[in-house]
Amino acid sequence: MNILTIDTGTTNTRVFAWRDGEVIAHSARQVGVRDTAITGSRHTLETGVQTAIQETLHHAGLGTDQVDLVLASGMITSNMGLHEVPHLLAPAGMGELAAAMVAAPIPAIWHQPVWLVPGVRNRVDHIGLHNVEAMDMMRGEEVESMALVKRLNICEPAVIVLPGSHSKFVSLDGAQRITGCVTTLAGELLQVITHNTILASSLDSGFADEIDREMLLAGARSAKQIGLGRACFSVRTLDQFTVYDRNA
Amino acid sequence: MSPGTQFVISGKPVLREALALLVQGDDFFSGAVNVVTDPQQTALAGFGAIAIAQARGLLEPAAIQVQ
């Protein structure tokens, strides 16, 4: 059985061809829903996804008539994607996600309906300043979480950490259902701080090559006590007046 | 979330190491910290989508295997 999986994020799309559970080819394009937000049109996203599909089929030596199933997840189901599917309310596990899948016609990328996996959002009603901290949502991390549940045989309550531009902390209950998530801008902040602030000089515009445990914990403690902005400036102070460098 | 909740940490190697150290150094959490290996996080989204499609009944069980 030949399957194509499409994973569209904010800035990237990855397509994999699978046969009998094994990856046989893949392709990636730097296109995502950010292009829709910037241009106000889905054309760039449609073209990028279609190109990634054709490249993957070419690498796999497959014709379109040899693909049995096309699955898609991530921001492709958002309002800036190619077919919007509402978030599923947590708690949601494998069964709930499976039941909520949608077969959608997206002729710009495939001649048959594409099966879409919805995202998941925290169960919070009447969102305002008083409870916004409790609200969060994901599109794409739910399939990654279910993959880790299956691959690692997770059978107890867990927090799955998925670092990225928007880092996710996904909470699972004992029934392997997603009960909610917390998202941070950690990845984007790290990128900006490293490359686009005065710290770029102290850090050689790069992340540490290796972790110094003492410095890592000191930094975390500092950010907790005096705030991220002040803790970040301490990096420049240490660079100016001590022997510490990017790797501590 | 209880203190004994286990953590499963994915991502790039240096980030995985840093996050694991932060969780292990946290006063509240005392559960197991499992750091995902590169092979375990290969093609994660596609693998998960196929597992969910299988639960939906869209493919036969042999089309996916636990790796």
Question: What are the residue ranges of the model-derived segments?
Answer:
Chain A
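Short glycine-aspartate micro-motif
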Residues: I3-D7, V67-L71, A158-L162
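Glycine-rich phosphate-binding loop plus the immediately following alpha-helix
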Residues: R34-S41, N122-S222
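ATP-binding/phosphotransfer module of carbohydrate and carboxylate kinases, centering on a glycine-rich
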Residues: W18, E22-I24, T197-A248
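Short beta-strand-loop/turn "lid" adjacent to the catalytic site in phosphate-handling enzymes
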Residues: A60-M135, G174
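Secondary-structure boundary elements
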Residues: D20, H58-D65, K150-V159
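Short glycine-rich, Thr/Ser-proximal phosphate-binding strand/loop in the N-terminal lobe
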Residues: I3-T44
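Short, well-ordered amphipathic alpha-helical segments that serve as non-catalytic structural scaffolds
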Residues: L45-A60
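A short acidic Gly-Thr/Ser loop motif
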Residues: I6-N12, M75, V161-H166, A186
